[in-house]
């Protein structure tokens, strides 16, 4: 599954610095980077040059991370990660100065408003955008404030949404949302203010589990938003419930799933894979390495 491969790349290669000193952008605009920044530069070069899947493709850009000159390694890593033309293929590899928060984030834990939003652009308002609520997390600030799927947000802190403030909907400790509804093809003129305060919470990726009848058949429906480790312990119970209800069909909705651990993916697959494929030993998952690691694999084998 492609999404797993992408997410594992993040988990394995997110360039979290060793040690306790944070690697902040060097405010010195001239001269050489500070020792901590220089260490981050070299670490990024070593990891990207050796372990990164597209190491050959970005090799020429690693010079931008020179410990002698690079004062913004986090920004440079983000800018040089693999593109195909103007398309950003790798959206996940990152250098971070907050490894604890990163580890929490890949476990679904972090400071959040407890919602997922999709961005849209007004056709008749130059430079202005709107946000549509895709879903809200159980017991999160958004749900507790009455937000629901389909709500439309047209202002942030009383101002129209633009490229300059759109991230306030995610990256602030509090926000005032101007929320409206869609009536037909038009946004309703009625706007209500919803105030949210971010909380540190676990966003359960098992968003919906239900059973319904369709065409004379019983269907199990699971909305699953991330292959984290914690949810791997709950998935077997979900499928036991489906089995107890004698479902005929199963829908697993992964539209908002950003990836996660292959371990959890394998648990899910073990509960739904057709027996014929299992007995035939069909390939379910493959791992792809760059040329350096592929050569090591060939020489040393799985051990």
Regions found by a protein language model. Name each.
Residues 259-303:
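Gly/Ser/Thr-rich loop/hinge elements
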Residues 108-155, 159-162, 221, 228-232:
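PDZ/PDZ-like domain segments forming the peptide/carboxylate-binding groove
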Residues 157, 162-247:
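C-terminal, low-ordered peptide segments at domain boundaries
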Residues 131, 149-151, 191, 217-220, ...:
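Loop/turn elements at helix/coil->beta-strand transitions in domains of secreted/extracellular proteins
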Residues 51, 121-123, 139-141, 159-161, ...:
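Solvent-exposed loop/turn segments at secondary-structure junctions
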Residues 46-53, 138, 152-158, 240-244, ...:
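Sec-exported extracytoplasmic/periplasmic mature domains
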Residues 3-5, 9-39:
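Bacterial Sec-dependent N-terminal signal peptides
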Residues 36-130, 179-208:
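Extended, small/polar residue-biased N-terminal targeting/export presequences
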């Amino acid at each position: 599954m492609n999404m797993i491969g992408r997410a594992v790349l993040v988990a394995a290669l997110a360039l979290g610095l060793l040690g306790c000193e944070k690697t902040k952008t060097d405010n010195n605009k001239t001269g050489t980077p500070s020792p901590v920044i220089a260490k981050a530069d070299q670490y990024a070069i070593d990891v990207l040059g050796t372990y990164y899947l597209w190491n050959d493709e970005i090799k020429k850009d690693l010079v931008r991370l020179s410990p002698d000159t690079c004062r913004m390694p986090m920004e440079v890593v983000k800018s040089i990660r693999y593109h195909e033309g103007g398309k950003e293929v790798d959206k996940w590899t990152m250098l971070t100065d907050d490894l604890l928060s990163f580890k929490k984030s890949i476990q679904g834990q972090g400071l959040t408003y407890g919602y997922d939003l999709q961005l849209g652009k007004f056709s008749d308002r130059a430079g202005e955008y709107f946000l549509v609520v895709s879903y809200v997390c159980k017991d999160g600030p958004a749900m507790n404030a009455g937000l629901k799927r389909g709500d439309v947000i047209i202002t942030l802190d009383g101002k129209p949404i633009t490229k300059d403030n759109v991230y306030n909907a995610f990256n602030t400790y509090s926000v005032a949302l101007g929320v409206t509804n869609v009536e037909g093809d038009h946004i309703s003129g009625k706007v209500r203010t919803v105030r949210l305060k971010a909380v540190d919470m676990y966003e359960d990726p098992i968003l919906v589990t239900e059973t319904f009848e369709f065409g004379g058949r019983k269907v199990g429906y699971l909305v699953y938003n991330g292959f984290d480790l914690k949810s791997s312990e709950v998935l077997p119970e979900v499928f036991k419930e489906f089995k107890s209800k004698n479902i005929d069909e199963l829908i697993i909705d992964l539209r908002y799933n950003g990836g996660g651990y292959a371990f959890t993916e394998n648990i899910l697959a073990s509960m739904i894979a057709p027996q014929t494929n299992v007995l035939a030993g069909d390939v379910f998952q493959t791992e792809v390495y760059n040329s350096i690691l592929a050569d090591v694999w060939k020489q040393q084998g799985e051990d």
